[in-house]
Regions:
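Electropositive, glycine- and tryptophan-enriched low-complexity nucleic-acid-binding patches
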Residues: 52-109
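An anionic, glycine-rich sequence signature occurring as long contiguous blocks
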Residues: 138-251, 355-370, 378
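Short acidic, glycine/serine/threonine-rich loops at helix termini
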Residues: 43-48, 75-81, 91-92, 126-132, ...
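Short, conserved catalytic/metal-binding motifs centered on acidic residues
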Residues: 29-39, 74, 115-124, 139-142, ...
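Short amphipathic alpha-helical "interface-anchor" segments enriched in bulky aromatics
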Residues: 229, 233-283, 310
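A short, flexible helix-boundary coil/loop motif
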Residues: 280-378
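Domain-level cores of phosphate- or acyl-group-handling catalytic modules
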Residues: 92-148
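Active-site-proximal, Lys/Arg-enriched surface segment
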Residues: 1-67
């Protein structure tokens, strides 16, 4: 099924022309592959289900996605079903999923810098980054800061900090970025890797953490991109959050539950869910380019494009009814005779009482003792 999806994907991309995700890709405008894991709850004991790190019970699949950018959605490149207790930063799993995603792209085993792989901190291991470097692709991977981060932060000169940007390119208030590659011991990491730190004031009401320094929340990521401003590289890395939207949409197409008992059967279900997600993405890519529906999620597409816009059912015997009136099974049914009374046999109701009329007292409910009430009593 995955091989068939790859063959159809390359055919769809060739039909899309200039709207294809691989149209005009280069080191400055690469094909983006996002890798992230998610949790899927299992409400009964199933093969492979296990406790998760969040206290639940189920599976921990690792996924990869082709990002269509701000003007589109995305496609499922690979899904690897794992037990719920699988490690979030397992390098072997990340390497397998990335290899399958590169095979789906059809650009060769070493596509070069025209492919960008983005991963959160779970992919920030020496094995995973080394694999990406050997494949000669661009990468932007979350980097775990060491324990002596406060000492590193104190060595950064003020002139090294540059304002961070929002997704729209405007400066972000209270956020800055700086490169700290020369301040770290990167022995064992691939050559040419850069580490960029981001500092930002926590939002009002947010709780401070023990690793916050001088009131700033510090994060970092690693990349092998040598050109571009630091703020632009940091925005490019944070746009990896679109992968969360793709995972949420995939859960609407079948990834959100695993009703089957066997692990192999649930792996097939993952492929079916990926195919359903890709069919919607391909339909939007080929038929809805330039329309707001190009970015709609599956539930919204289903309601507005498939269900809400279907043609109405023709009336029996109407001009738009393709069936002849005498061929309809209800044509020769004798009409039901009307009931002699509109209330279906009930006696007619008494006319409504006149205004100010009081019904006579019920003898069964009158008092057996005491004086009678006056006639003009309310």
């Amino acid at each position: 099924m995955e091989a068939a999806r790859g063959e159809v994907r390359r055919r769809v991309w060739s039909l899309a022309g200039e709207n294809s995700p691989t149209a005009g890709i280069s080191a400055e405008s690469p094909l983006v592959i996002d890798v992230d894991a998610t949790l899927v709850e299992a409400h009964s004991a199933k093969e492979g289900a296990a406790p998760t790190f969040k206290g639940g019970f189920g599976y921990h699949p690792l996924t990869a996605w082709f990002d269509h950018g701000a003007d589109g959605a995305g496609e499922c490149a690979a899904i690897m079903l794992r037990p719920g207790n699988a490690g979030a930063n397992t390098a072997a799993d990340h390497i397998e999923v990335i290899s399958r995603a590169l095979a789906q792209a059809g650009l060769g085993s070493r596509p070069g810098r025209k492919v960008l792989v983005r991963i959160d901190g779970a992919g920030g291991t020496k094995e995973t980054v080394g694999f990406l470097a050997r494949r000669r692709v661009s990468y932007s991977v979350g980097f775990k800061l060491p324990g002596h981060t406060p000492d590193i932060y104190s060595k950064i000169p003020k002139s090294a900090w540059a304002p961070a940007y929002n997704a729209d390119g405007d400066p972000r208030e209270g956020a800055d970025v700086a490169e700290i590659t020369d301040l770290l011991d990167l022995s064992g990491w691939p050559e040419g890797m850069r580490v960029i730190m981001r500092r930002e004031r926590p939002h009002p009401g947010a709780r401070l953490r023990f690793d916050d320094v001088d009131g700033y929340r510090l994060t970092a990521f690693a990349t092998n991109t040598r050109t571009g401003q630091l703020a632009d590289l940091e925005v490019r890395h944070r746009l990896r959050a679109r992968c969360e939207d793709r995972i949420r949409c995939a859960k609407d197409t079948g990834l959100g539950s695993f009703p089957l008992q066997g692990l192999a059967a649930n792996r097939i279900r993952c492929q079916v869910a990926a195919l359903a997600h890709d069919l919607l993405a391909w339909s939007q890519l080929l038929a809805l380019t330039g329309h707001p529906a190009r970015k709609w999620e599956p539930t919204w597409v289903t309601f507005n494009y498939f269900w809400h816009r279907r043609p109405p059912r023709p009336q029996v015997g109407a001009q738009d009814d393709p069936r002849p009136a005498d061929a309809h099974p209800r044509h020769h049914r004798p009409p039901r005779p009307p009931h002699p009374h509109p209330l279906q046999g009930r006696p007619p109701l008494d006319p409504p009482p006149a205004p100010g009329h009081r019904p006579p007292p019920d003898p069964a409910r009158t008092l057996t003792s005491g004086p009678p009430p006056p006639e003009n009593a309310p």
